[in-house]
């Protein structure tokens, strides 16, 4: 695999994570409305984890330029 291909994959993963993060937050709101507080909290934590993963993926992209 080339460096450019790997960069492309990382960019894709960041975008993909963001799509899932947004969806998880939407579903957390729905769970809250249904009175499923424990489910909502865990969905929010999952969304937070995806945000953290994306942060590290962005750091990996920056590392290509170092």
Language-model-detected regions and their locations in the chain:
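Short, charge-rich amphipathic interface segments used for partner binding and complex assembly
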Residues: 30-63
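N-terminal acidic leader/helix
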Residues: 1-30
